[in-house]
């Protein structure tokens, strides 16, 4: 059977960055891997960031769009059926940051997928710089995406102050208690290390971490209404201008609660990727891109954000 690993995590936690490293480890171990990318919105930016991994032993499939639950399940099921025919021995799925994890388990239990796939590891990426105060909906998603994880992998630990990562795990455990889940994470359930220092032994630990059977009380809300994804194509702005716009959007409440700004910008000699959260903005070169900026958050003012992005 093909082993499926799921990498979960709230918006902007660093799932794609970790997935890249994890898949490189799996390929080095001799596995043939297919990545299934499911981004929040109509343009799959994260899949573009992984294109250089494609080769003899690695390929990428995508599901894009904030569609309804039934349509999303149907698309994922169809992708998994087609992937099963292609001879991969490992599949790694990176869902969007507002993914209902139960959807995934339901799909794997369906015929004929239950005969072709086995669930390997559920890996939850949690930002060591996570905001202290989140909305009830965001806290629920944080908890539900980690509840069945075999391991929590902390991101951006090198930027965290002493005690900050531990406080985030306390936050996660409070969020789990808030949805009446018995699961709690302690030191043995968490990998807290600068990702630049991760070893083969660390990735082997991730590979064998498995998953946990758990339950929690669902918070019923429409994730795609609570969390909005706005797309701005061909804004015609420089890297410096987009960086300044992202900084403004993330720190001025008049635009709504902006959680993340990401996208690609032409810089004259090629393309750069911008990835911005409230406490950090990174800009780095990439081989290719599409001129698009995506703003994700809660209660967003589209008109005001478009003015800030386009500078008009």
Feature names for model-found ranges:
Residues 111-117, 142-143, 169-178:
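A short alpha->loop->secondary-structure connector
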Residues 3, 72, 100, 145, ...:
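Helical mechanochemical/support elements of P-loop NTPase systems and associated helical scaffolds
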Residues 151-154, 159-289, 300-303, 307-312:
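C-terminal accessory "lid"/substrate-recognition subdomains
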Residues 140-141, 148:
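Short, glycine-/small-residue-rich phosphate/pyrophosphate-handling segment
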Residues 291-297:
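Short, well-ordered beta-strand elements
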Residues 51-55, 145, 181-185:
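Short, conserved catalytic or adaptor-binding loops enriched in Gly and charged residues
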Residues 2-8, 13, 17-135, 140:
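Nucleotide-state-sensitive switch-loop elements of NTP-binding domains
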Residues 121, 150-151:
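Well-ordered beta-strand positions
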């Amino acid at each position: 059977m093909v082993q499926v690993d799921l990498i979960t995590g709230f918006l902007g936690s660093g799932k794609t960055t970790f997935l890249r490293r994890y898949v490189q480890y799996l390929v080095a171990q001799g596995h043939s891997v297919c990545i299934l990318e499911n981004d929040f919105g109509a343009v799959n930016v994260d899949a573009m960031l992984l294109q250089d991994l494609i080769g003899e032993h690695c390929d990428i499939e995508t599901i894009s769009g904030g569609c309804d639950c039934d349509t999303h399940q149907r698309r994922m099921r169809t992708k998994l059926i087609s992937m099963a025919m292609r001879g991969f021995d490992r599949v790694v799925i990176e869902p969007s940051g507002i993914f209902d994890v139960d959807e995934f388990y339901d799909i794997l239990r369906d015929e004929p997928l239950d005969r072709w796939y086995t669930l390997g590891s559920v890996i939850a990426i949690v930002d060591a710089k996570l905001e202290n105060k989140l909305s009830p909906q965001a806290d629920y998603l944080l908890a539900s995406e980690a509840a069945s994880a075999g391991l929590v992998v902390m991101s951006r630990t090198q930027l965290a102050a002493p005690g900050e990562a531990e406080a985030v795990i306390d936050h996660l455990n409070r969020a789990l208690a808030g949805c009446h889940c018995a699961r709690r994470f302690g030191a043995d359930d968490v990998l807290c290390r600068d990702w630049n220092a991760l070893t083969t032994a660390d990735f082997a630990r991730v590979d064998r971490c498995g998953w946990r059977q758990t339950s929690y009380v669902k918070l019923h809300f429409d994730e795609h209404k609570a969390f909005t994804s706005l797309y701005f194509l061909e804004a015609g702005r420089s890297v410096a201008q987009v960086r300044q716009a992202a900084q403004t959007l993330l720190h001025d409440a008049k635009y709504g609660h902006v959680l993340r700004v990401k996208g690609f910008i032409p810089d004259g000699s090629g393309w750069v990727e911008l990835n911005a959260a409230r406490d950090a903005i990174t800009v780095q070169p990439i081989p290719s891109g599409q001129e698009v900026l995506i703003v994700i958050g809660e209660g967003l003012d589209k008109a005001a954000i478009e003015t800030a992005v386009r500078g008009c």
